[in-house]
C-alpha cells in the first residue's frame, strides 16, 4: 500500500475514535450534590443524560424510603418534583439512567428548613411610663430549631439575645420566643423595638436567612396633675356667669369630662369639653363640680365648689368716679341700678348749681348728657337711685381741660455748627395750665424742662412757651428735637395727657478747608493748558464759585464748576484767581496766583551815536525787549579768546572814549524762564587822522578790511532778518553759511 494511503487511513481512524469518545454516555443532576428547600415550598430535581437517544430513568432514596414526589420523564431528561416539601423529603436522592448495557447514577442530598414568617412582637400590656412591661418576640414554625438565634433591640440598644443551639433535634415545626422585661421612660417615645430572628443555614439566601419585625414604641402616661381654673371667682352673684377650665397631663392627651356631684354622690355629666361655662346662675347652681381627665390607661380628677349668692342692690356710675372732659366735647354720665327691677333716678351737682345737661331715664339706667362742655360744667355730680324703701347715691367728678393741639417748635435761624441758636416750644390753648409741664429734648438729652405749677389757676385758655438756647454740633445731625407737653390731671388719670412734636436736626457746617490744586503748575508758558480745581468741606456740600480778582480788588465771577480750565493760556490770563465755597452757613475763600510766562520777542539792539565811531567818542549800546517786562538782558562782546559779559544797566552799556580795541561784534541775549532770543551788531572804531598825504599801513589794512566788511554786513542783515522770523540769530552760523 502506498505511504500516502496509509497516512490517510490512519488519520481517519483517529478522527473516528475522537468522535466516538465525544459522544460517550454521560449523566448530570441539578442542583448538584446538595440543595435545601423550605417546608411547604415546591422543589424540582432534574436528571439529564447525553450520548443516549432513549435512556431509561429511575429515582429512589438512598435508604429506599418512599419518594413522596412525582416523576416526569421526557426524552433525555427526568424531573422529580416535591410539592409541597415536607419532612419526608429530607433524603439523599439517586437518579439512575440506563442506555443499552450502560448504567449511570448520580445522587443529591435534600435538606429542609422552615422559616416562613417574620417574628411577632407581643406586650404584656400597654407601655406606661414608670411601670414594668414584658415584651415577647416570637419566631413561629421554625425548623431546625437548633440553628435559630433571636435578638431584641430597643433603638440601637441590644436588650437580649438567645441562641437555641442546645435544643434537641426533632422533626417538627416549633415556635420559639425571647422575653424581656423593661420599664418604659418618656424618652422611649418614637424609638423602634426590633425583633430579629436568624436561621444559620449556609445554603439559604441571605434575604431568607434573617427576618425582623419593627414596632414603634407608643409610651403612655396615665392622667395626672388635673387642675381647674375658675373665672371670675368661685363665689358668684345671682345672675352672673362663670367659666371653668380644666387641664390634665397625660399621654395620649386625656379627654376632659365635666360633671356635678348630686346629693347621692352620683356624678351628673355636664360636658365633654375642657371649658365649662355657666350663665345666668341661680342659687341652686351652687355645688361641687368635678373635672375628670381620662385616657387609655387611667383617669384623674379634680373638684371645685361654686357658691352662688343672692344678687344685691348696687348703684354704678360710668365712665367712672372721675371724668376728664375737653372743652367743647360732649360728656355722657350713665347711672345704673343693679339688683332692682324698677328704680327711680335723680341728678344734682354737689353745690346745687344748674345741671346744664339733659337727663334721660330708661329702665334700670339714667343718662346725663352735657353738650359742648365749658368751664361752668366743672362739678361733682350725684346720681340718687331709689329702690323700694332704699336709696343709694353715687358721685362722679367732671374735670374740664383743654389740650387740643400738638406743641409747635420754632428756631431763631438755621442750625450751624458752633453757632448758638434759640429754640422755643409753644403749647397753645391750655387749661388748666398750672398742671402743664413742657420738656425740650435733643435726642435723649433734656435741654430744658419747666412746670407751670406756680402760675395762678384762672379759668381761661392760655398759650405757654418754653425757650432755650443751645450750640449745635455736627454730631446733632440725625438726632431729633422733641417738644413734649404733659397735662397732669391729678388723681383723675394714672398717666398724664401727652402731646409732642418732633423736628429732625440737620446741622449745617460752614465751608472750610477750601483747597486749590493747579495742574500742571501755577507758572506756565503762554499757550499751555491749565486746570484749576477747587474743593471745600461743609454741610451741605458747598457750592463752588470761581472769580478773578481785578486791580481794584473786586471779584469778577467766572465759573460755578469745581474745575476752571484754560485750554490755551495768554499773557493776559496772569493774575489772582479766587475760589469760594458757599453754603447756607457761610463762605470759605482761597486764592492762587497764575503766572503766564512769554518767550522774549521784538528784541532791539541799538548803538548810539552810530555803528561807526571815531576813537575817543562816547558810545552807548542798548538792548531792549518790548513784549516781556520781566526778562534778563545780557550784553556780551565776542572775542576769539572767549565772550566777555559787559556790565550793563537796564540793558545799556556805555563806552567812554572809545578805543580801537572796542571795535568788534556785540551780542545781546534776552532771557526768560521759558526761552531766549539773540541780537548782534558790529561796532567800528576809527583811528584819529594826522596827515592827509600819509597813507599808513594800518589805514591800508583798514581799507582792505572795510572792503570785506560791507558784503559781510549785508549777509548779517540777511541772516538777522531770517533769524527774526525764526525767533533767534547766531552770527557764527551766519558766517559759516557765508563761507
Swiss-Prot record:
Q: What does this protein do?
A: Cell adhesion glycoprotein predominantly expressed on the surface of endothelial cells that plays an important role in immune surveillance and inflammation. Acts as a major regulator of leukocyte adhesion to the endothelium through interaction with different types of integrins. During inflammatory responses, binds ligands on the surface of activated endothelial cells to initiate the activation of calcium channels and the plasma membrane-associated small GTPase RAC1 leading to leukocyte transendothelial migration.
Pfam families for this protein:
C2-set, I-set, Ig_3
Which biological process, per GO, is one annotated for this protein? leukocyte cell-cell adhesion
Q: Provide the glycosylation site positions.
A: 225, 273, 424, 531, 561
- Species whose genome carries this gene: Mus musculus
Assembly and interaction partners: (Microbial infection) Interacts with ECMV-D capsid proteins and acts as a receptor for this virus.
The membrane spanning regions, by residue number, are: 699-720
Q: Name one GO molecular function term.
A: integrin binding
The record places the following residue ranges in the Cytoplasmic compartment, namely: 721-739
How would you describe the post-translational modification of this protein?
Cleaved by the metalloproteinase ADAM17 to generate the soluble form.
Protein's recorded name? Vascular cell adhesion protein 1
Q: List the disulfide bonds.
A: 47-95, 52-99, 137-195, 246-291, 335-383, 534-579
Amino acid at each position: 500500500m502506498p505511504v500516502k494511503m496509509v497516512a490517510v487511513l490512519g488519520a481517519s481512524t483517529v478522527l473516528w475514535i475522537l468522535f466516538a469518545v465525544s459522544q460517550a454516555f454521560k449523566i448530570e443532576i441539578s442542583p448538584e450534590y446538595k440543595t435545601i428547600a423550605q417546608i411547604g415550598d415546591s422543589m424540582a430535581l432534574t436528571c439529564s443524560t447525553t450520548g443516549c437517544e432513549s435512556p431509561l430513568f429511575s429515582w429512589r432514596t438512598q435508604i429506599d424510603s418512599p419518594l413522596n414526589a412525582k416523576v416526569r420523564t421526557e426524552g433525555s431528561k427526568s424531573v422529580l418534583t416535591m410539592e409541597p416539601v415536607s419532612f419526608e423529603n429530607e433524603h439523599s436522592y439517586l437518579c439512575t439512567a440506563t442506555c443499552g448495557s450502560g448504567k449511570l447514577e448520580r445522587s443529591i442530598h435534600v435538606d429542609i428548613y422552615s422559616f416562613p414568617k417574620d417574628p411577632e412582637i407581643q406586650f404584656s400590656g400597654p407601655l406606661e411610663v414608670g411601670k414594668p412591661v414584658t415584651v415577647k418576640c416570637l419566631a413561629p414554625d421554625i425548623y431546625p430549631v437548633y440553628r435559630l438565634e433571636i435578638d431584641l433591640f430597643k433603638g440601637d440598644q441590644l436588650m437580649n439575645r438567645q441562641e437555641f443551639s442546645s435544643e434537641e433535634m426533632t422533626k417538627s415545626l416549633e415556635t420559639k420566643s425571647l422575653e424581656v422585661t423593661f420599664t418604659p421612660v418618656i424618652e422611649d417615645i418614637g424609638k423602634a423595638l426590633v425583633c430579629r430572628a436568624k436561621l444559620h443555614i449556609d445554603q439559604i439566601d441571605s434575604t431568607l436567612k434573617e427576618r425582623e419585625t419593627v414596632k414603634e414604641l407608643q409610651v403612655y402616661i396615665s392622667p395626672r396633675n388635673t387642675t381647674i381654673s375658675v373665672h371670675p371667682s368661685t363665689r358668684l352673684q345671682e345672675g352672673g356667669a362663670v367659666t371653668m377650665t380644666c387641664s390634665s397631663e397625660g399621654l395620649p392627651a386625656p379627654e376632659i369630662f365635666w360633671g356635678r356631684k348630686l346629693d347621692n354622690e352620683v356624678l351628673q355629666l355636664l360636658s365633654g369639653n375642657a371649658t365649662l361655662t355657666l350663665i345666668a346662675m341661680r342659687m341652686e347652681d351652687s355645688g361641687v363640680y368635678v373635672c375628670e381627665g381620662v385616657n387609655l390607661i387611667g383617669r384623674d380628677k379634680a373638684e371645685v365648689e361654686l357658691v352662688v349668692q343672692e344678687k344685691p342692690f348696687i348703684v354704678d356710675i360710668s365712665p367712672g368716679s372721675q371724668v376728664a372732659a375737653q372743652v367743647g366735647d360732649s360728656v355722657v354720665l350713665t347711672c345704673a341700678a343693679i339688683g332692682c327691677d324698677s328704680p327711680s333716678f335723680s341728678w344734682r351737682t354737689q353745690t346745687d348749681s344748674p345741671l346744664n345737661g339733659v337727663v334721660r331715664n330708661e329702665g334700670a339706667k339714667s343718662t346725663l348728657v352735657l353738650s359742648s362742655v365749658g368751664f361752668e360744667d366743672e362739678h361733682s355730680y350725684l346720681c340718687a337711685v331709689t329702690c323700694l324703701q332704699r336709696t343709694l347715691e353715687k358721685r362722679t367728678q367732671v374735670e374740664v381741660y383743654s389740650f387740643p393741639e400738638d406743641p409747635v417748635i420754632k428756631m431763631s435761624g438755621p442750625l450751624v455748627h458752633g453757632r448758638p441758636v434759640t429754640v422755643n416750644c409753644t403749647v397753645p390753648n391750655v387749661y388748666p395750665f398750672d398742671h402743664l409741664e413742657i420738656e425740650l429734648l435733643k435726642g435723649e438729652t433734656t435741654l430744658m424742662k419747666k412746670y407751670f405749677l406756680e402760675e395762678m389757676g384762672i379759668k381761661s385758655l392760655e398759650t405757654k412757651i418754653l425757650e432755650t438756647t443751645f450750640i449745635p454740633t455736627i454730631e446733632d445731625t440725625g438726632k431729633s428735637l422733641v417738644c413734649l407737653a404733659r397735662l397732669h390731671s391729678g388723681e383723675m388719670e394714672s398717666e398724664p395727657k401727652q402731646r409732642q412734636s418732633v423736628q429732625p436736626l440737620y446741622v449745617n457746617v460752614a465751608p472750610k478747608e477750601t483747597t486749590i490744586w493747579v495742574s500742571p503748575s501755577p507758572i506756565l508758558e503762554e499757550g499751555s493748558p491749565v486746570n484749576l480745581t477747587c474743593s471745600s468741606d461743609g454741610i451741605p456740600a458747598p457750592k463752588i464759585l470761581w472769580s478773578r480778582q481785578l486791580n481794584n480788588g473786586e471779584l469778577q465771577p467766572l465759573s460755578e464748576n469745581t474745575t476752571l480750565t484754560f485750554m490755551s493760556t495768554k499773557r493776559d490770563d496772569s493774575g489772582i484767581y479766587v475760589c469760594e465755597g458757599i453754603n447756607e452757613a457761610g463762605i470759605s475763600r482761597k486764592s492762587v496766583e497764575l503766572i503766564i510766562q512769554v518767550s522774549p520777542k521784538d528784541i532791539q539792539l541799538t548803538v548810539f551815536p552810530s555803528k561807526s565811531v571815531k576813537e575817543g567818542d562816547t558810545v552807548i549800546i542798548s538792548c531792549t525787549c518790548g513784549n516781556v517786562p520781566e526778562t534778563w538782558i545780557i550784553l556780551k562782546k565776542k572775542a576769539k579768546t572767549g565772550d566777555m559779559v559787559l556790565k550793563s544797566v537796564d540793558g545799556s552799556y556805555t563806552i567812554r572814549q572809545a578805543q580801537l580795541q572796542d571795535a568788534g561784534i556785540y551780542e545781546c541775549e534776552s532771557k526768560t524762564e521759558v526761552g531766549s532770543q539773540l541780537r548782534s551788531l558790529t561796532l567800528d572804531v576809527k583811528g584819529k587822522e594826522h596827515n592827509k598825504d600819509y597813507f599808513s599801513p594800518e589805514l591800508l589794512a583798514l581799507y582792505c578790511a572795510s572792503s570785506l566788511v560791507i558784503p559781510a554786513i549785508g549777509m548779517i542783515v540777511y541772516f538777522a532778518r531770517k533769524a527774526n522770523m525764526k525767533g533767534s540769530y547766531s552770527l557764527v552760523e551766519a558766517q559759516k553759511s557765508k563761507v
